[in-house]
């Protein structure tokens, strides 16, 4: 039997804060990695490409690895503040999420380990690197209810794909099933 890992968004905002605080007390780089993911909605492969010099402006310009599409986006104010604090004493050519071994970025596998451990410590399960992106999408949807905007951000081809990706479809299905009574 094949085991399928289902990766979920973090639906509870208090848990998002708890995980960030946990990471902040352990390692500033790792806390920023978490914040970057939940506030940008970028894939981990794109997040890990950032260098310190990419964070000096009021937003970012990136060509997404998976889609090869260009994106120009303003920083979220909370992320911008965290970035300013973190990069103040860093070399502009350094990777933002620098590995301890050399001037390379941490790997996707290391990012996964960081996120998984922090979430498990805070009793949040079914997580992976996509959890950050899905968390961004989930909470953005709850605020805006704008599926078209999220489709554009995520480069999805249909509303159904986006809603399923951010965990809204399953949540609605579960609520409906619980209400069923004969």
What are these regions (language model features)?
Residues 1-182:
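Conserved catalytic core of the tyrosine transesterase superfamily
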